Amino acid sequence: MAHDDQYFLGHSSVEQRRLQQQAGELAEESARLFDQIGLAQGSRAVEIGCGPQGCLELLSSRVGPTGSVVGVELSDHAVQLAREFLSERRIKNVEVRQGNAAATGLPRERFDLATARLVLVNIPEPEKIVAEMASLVRSGGVVALHEADWSAHVCDPPLPAWDRLKVALVTYSEQKGIDLYIGRRIARMLRNAGLVDVQVHPLIHIYAPNHSRRPIFLQFVNNLRDRILAEGLISEAEFAECIASLEGHLAKPETLVISHLFIQAWGRKP
């Protein structure tokens, strides 16, 4: 990967498949966000950190054949997957470029909308990305974010293994400059980037048995297992014990799993 690739969850094939699945899981929420913004036919939109699919299809349908969408993604593999997805769907008004979210190289003040979904929660120095997004939109254009705040992501009955793994994960993220609670800050970040008329919409869910996102915490800690162990934040034996306990707990239909608090926020460039 590029030397400046700092994406928290990495770019493994497993992570790319998770992101492809996530695109479908979050499509309805993203569609409502774009509906509230009022993205018109003929608009020009850019998605930062689009991954292998992101919101590209949703944006394509809204801007229509007279509009255009650019997806920016750092991972070469994800760029390839996104281009294959667009080709399979015969989507002609979207292009995907390999690039850094904080320095896209795209023309300034060109777009009607710049958007990112669950990118800032996985990247150090997220303010640089918001500033870049603000620079890309024209006067009157909109920057829209959809981010997570981990504070609400809990289970009931409580489970010591959940708490132990979460401490290890949060500690590791802090060491890498990642803010897992960034959702609560994004409205302020938009204002600090010079945007006005900032709007905020919260989202939270219960992940019932058989819900595809019920094991999301388990997926994250397994993804980061080797790196967490390498930092000495938990022993290999304790990690394995906690994973087994968590798997059993999630398998019980009476276990309540509450999602992250998701925050959608958007603002207009004066």
Regions found by a protein language model. Give the residues of each.
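Conserved catalytic/acceptor-binding region of the Class I
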Residues: A144-H211
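C-terminal helical/coil "lid" or tail adjacent to the Rossmann-like core of SAM-dependent
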Residues: F8, V14-E15, Q199-V257
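Class I SAM-dependent methyltransferase Rossmann-like catalytic core
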Residues: D4-L26
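A short acidic, Gly/Pro-enriched loop at the edge of an enzyme's catalytic core
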Residues: T104-L113
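A short glycine-rich, Lys/Arg-flanked "PGG" loop and its adjoining helix->strand segment in the class I
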Residues: E127-V142
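Conserved alpha-helix/loop element of class I SAM-dependent methyltransferases that forms part
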Residues: G24-R44, L58
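Class I SAM-dependent methyltransferase SAM/SAH-binding core
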Residues: V46, P52-T104
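A short SAM/SAH-binding and catalytic strip from SAM-dependent methyltransferases
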Residues: D112-E127
